[in-house]
């Protein structure tokens, strides 16, 4: 693991931008993208950068079940709002949250990942150590699957909705094995609320109780953490 400590959120985004610039310059063609509040500062920098994404493919980690891409709370909408409207990709894949045939949607997404091996996978981390929507207890061998969100994850995401009861309780997510198949992984963690998860990921045992701990086994992982997120290392 390559651990990069920075002062604050702004510096974390600047360092992440450098990693993206370097990856694309060295031929990265497929970028795995994440949602949530953590990557927004990076996306703001990517949106105004000189990087040309028009020949690249993006693959997102997850999507809420039951929301289509026009819904303002969907992750497709999130990506359009924060990045895609400024930097279009050749193809942008997000799981189909509205498909009534979940098994078909899962197989289709797994096929996309196999056909487009991810060069650089971006991750955030949940307070409970989840990556994507892979909650504690998720098998390290998992591929794309339907997830029942934990109460802590629902509560953490409630700030994006009018009220907590509006937060979907299920999602379709790339699995941990899918994430680990990426050539390079970049995890960004900022804020004191992520400090325990960061410590468990870097220094704790590798356990499905802390999904992100599996990153210790990946050959090319960079973790960018600000002072607050590093406070329990």
Swiss-Prot record:
Group of enzyme by EC: hydrolase
Catalyzed chemical reaction(s): alpha-D-glucosamine 6-phosphate + H2O = beta-D-fructose 6-phosphate + NH4(+)
One of the record's GO cellular component terms: cytoplasm
Biological-process GO terms, alphabetical: carbohydrate metabolic process; glucosamine catabolic process; N-acetylglucosamine catabolic process; N-acetylneuraminate catabolic process
Record key words, sorted: Carbohydrate metabolism, Hydrolase
EC annotation from Swiss-Prot or TrEMBL: 3.5.99.6
Domain of life (superkingdom): Bacteria
Positions of disulphide bridges: none
Molecular function terms from GO: glucosamine-6-phosphate deaminase activity; identical protein binding
Entry annotation: catalytic residues: 62, 128, 130, 135
Stretches assigned to coiled coil: none
Pathway: Amino-sugar metabolism; N-acetylneuraminate degradation; D-fructose 6-phosphate from N-acetylneuraminate: step 5/5
One of the Pfam families matching this protein, by short name: Glucosamine_iso
Main function: Catalyzes the reversible isomerization-deamination of glucosamine 6-phosphate (GlcN6P) to form fructose 6-phosphate (Fru6P) and ammonium ion.
Record-stated family: Belongs to the glucosamine/galactosamine-6-phosphate isomerase family. NagB subfamily.
NCBIfam families registered for this protein in UniProt: nagB
HAMAP family in alphabetical order: GlcN6P_deamin (MF_01241)
Protein name: Glucosamine-6-phosphate deaminase
